[in-house]
């Protein structure tokens, strides 16, 4: 039973670490998306900024902003799906009550 408990704890720790990594990526994604939106807003306000950022944005996003948004939506759906899977697995692990056999009372 102790080995099963250690394996469950190890799996729980791995899942928790994966959750933290996904959460970090999601935060970065939102930061990048906000910066791109800011650049687009600034570009719309000033013709000079428009010319300067046009080439930068084209180099970064050759498929255009619409293509980036489509890819971002796909990625976001994947992340949400992974979060849901992670949540289900964590609930399963939490539902498993660890059973320890008291020392000296083993079956033979």
UniProtKB/Swiss-Prot annotation:
Which cysteine-cysteine pairs are annotated as disulfide bonds in the entry? none
Q: Briefly describe its induction.
A: Expression is regulated by the two-component regulatory system SsrA/SsrB. Expressed when residing in the host ileal loop, host macrophages, and when in an acidic environment. Repressed by methyl-3,4-dephostatin.
- Sorted UniProt keywords: Chaperone, Coiled coil, Cytoplasm, Virulence
Q: What happens when the gene is disrupted?
A: Mutant is severely attenuated in virulence.
Task: Using the record for this protein, list the coiled-coil segments as residue ranges, or answer none.
Answer: 69-97
Q: Where in the cell is it found?
A: Cytoplasm
**Gene Ontology cellular component terms for the protein in this record:** cytoplasm
Q: Report the domain remarks.
A: The N-terminal region is dispensable for binding and stabilizing SseB, but is essential for export of SseB to the surface of the bacterium.
Q: What does this protein do?
A: Functions as a type III secretion system (T3SS) chaperone, which is required for SseB and SseD accumulation and secretion. May have a direct role in secretion of SseB and SseD, or may facilitate their correct folding, for efficient secretion and function. Required for survival and replication within epithelial cells and macrophages.
Subunit-level organization = Binds to SseB and SseD.
| Protein name from the UniProt record | Type III secretion system chaperone SseA
Q: Specify the species.
A: Salmonella typhimurium (strain LT2 / SGSC1412 / ATCC 700720)
Query: What gene is this protein a product of?
Result: sseA
